[in-house]
């Protein structure tokens, strides 16, 4: 069986001096290898082909047959690595907490422990007849959430 660690090392070698970053590598028991990469400005098919060929040049099909799939972390898919949070600062995201609360807002900040989303809430000021929209920052730790993903808007 092909080791995940081996594939990760090969991908990291290809990533040197490139603006891409590794999102995930999975290797199934039947040696299906799936590599997900991402880039702040999107992933180009030519680069996926180049990475695929690079991986194939480092693995020996004569020793062990495998299936290889190289692609981008899909738009609208949950974030898997911190770099995805950094790349989406200033953009709208959707968050689902482990408590089942779903909200959307603008990703304001992120670090290794937490991230901040600016959400709009309706608040009725004292003496006012109607509620007003107010922006409020909500902070989450990564352990508090089921997922965060880029919110695709067609407005």
From Swiss-Prot:
InterPro entries: Ribosome_maturation_RimP, RimP_C, RimP_N, RimP_N_sf
Protein name from the UniProt record: Ribosome maturation factor RimP
Organism: Bacteroides fragilis (strain ATCC 25285 / DSM 2151 / CCUG 4856 / JCM 11019 / LMG 10263 / NCTC 9343 / Onslow / VPI 2553 / EN-2)
Ranges in coiled-coil conformation: none
Function as written in the Swiss-Prot or TrEMBL entry: Required for maturation of 30S ribosomal subunits.
Major localization listed first in the record, in broad terms: cytoplasm
BP-aspect Gene Ontology terms: ribosomal small subunit assembly; translation
NCBIfam families (UniProt xref): PRK02001.1
Subcellular location: Cytoplasm
Classification via SUPFAM superfamilies: YhbC-like, N-terminal domain
Signal peptide location: none
UniProt key word Plastid: no
Any one GO cellular component localisation term in the record: cytosol
Record keywords: Cytoplasm, Ribosome biogenesis
């Amino acid at each position: 069986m092909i080791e995940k660690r081996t594939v990760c090392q090969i991908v990291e070698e290809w990533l040197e001096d490139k603006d891409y970053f590794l999102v995930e590598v999975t290797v199934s028991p039947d040696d299906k290898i799936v590599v997900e990469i991402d880039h702040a400005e999107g992933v180009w098919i030519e680069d996926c082909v180049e990475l695929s060929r690079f991986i194939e040049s480092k693995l020996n099909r004569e020793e062990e047959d495998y299936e290889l799939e190289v692609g981008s972390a899909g738009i609208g898919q949950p974030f898997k690595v911190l770099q995805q949070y950094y790349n989406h600062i200033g953009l709208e995201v959707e968050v689902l907490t482990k408590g089942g609360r779903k909200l959307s807002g603008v990703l304001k900040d992120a670090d290794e422990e937490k991230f901040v989303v600016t959400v709009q809430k309706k608040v009725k000021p004292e003496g006012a007849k109607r509620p007003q929209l107010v922006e409020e920052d909500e902070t989450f730790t990564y352990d508090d959430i089921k997922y965060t993903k880029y919110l695709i808007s067609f407005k």
